[in-house]
From Swiss-Prot:
Protein name per the record: Large ribosomal subunit protein bL21c
Family according to the record: Belongs to the bacterial ribosomal protein bL21 family.
Keywords attached to this entry: Chloroplast, Plastid, Ribonucleoprotein, Ribosomal protein, RNA-binding, rRNA-binding
Gene Ontology molecular function: rRNA binding; structural constituent of ribosome
Gene Ontology biological process: translation
Location within or outside the cell: Plastid, Chloroplast
Record note on quaternary structure: Part of the 50S ribosomal subunit.
Organism encoding this protein: Huperzia lucidula (Shining clubmoss)
GO cellular component, one term: chloroplast
Record bears the keyword rRNA-binding: yes
Keyword Cytoplasm appears in the UniProt entry: no
Alphabetized Pfam families for the sequence: Ribosomal_L21p
InterPro entries: bL21-like (IPR028909), bL21-like_sf (IPR036164), Ribosomal_bL21 (IPR001787)
Domain of life, source organism: Eukaryota
């Protein structure tokens, strides 16, 4: 069993592992237009770190724990169509929305500023 962590970002909780990539909607307070590919990121909202033998749970977050990663690219999610119609009023409105996503890869899971679990090359 590989080491993994549970983080909170973009209003979601994600189970992350080193070497895997994830799509996040609202990346904390970071603006996706200002972040280019290969930008380094640190995520401090780590809820849990699980090793092969130990589980560390924070209340609500673990102190000294962070996730190191880098941004691969930003992209748009699939289009959602919103159609509003009022019957017998001849009022119709059709809108579409594409959510901005950021794809990032987890390089390592750190606890107490030590790299515990790194990406396997």
């Amino acid at each position: 069993m590989n080491a993994y962590a549970v983080i909170e970002t973009g209003g979601e909780q994600l189970r992350v592992e080193p070497g895997r990539f994830y799509d996040v909607r609202h990346f904390a307070s970071l603006n996706p237009e200002n972040l280019g590919p290969n930008s380094k990121i640190l995520i401090y909202r780590v809820l849990m770190i699980c090793d092969e033998s130990t589980i560390n749970i924070g209340h609500p977050w673990l102190k000294g724990a962070m996730i190191k990663g880098r941004i691969l690219h930003s992209r748009l999610d699939n289009k959602i169509t919103v159609y509003r119609m009022r019957s017998k009023k001849k009022t119709r409105r059709k809108l579409g929305h594409r959510q901005k996503l950021i794809r990032f890869v987890v390089d390592s899971i750190c606890s107490d500023v030590k790299d515990l679990y790194k990406q396997k090359d």
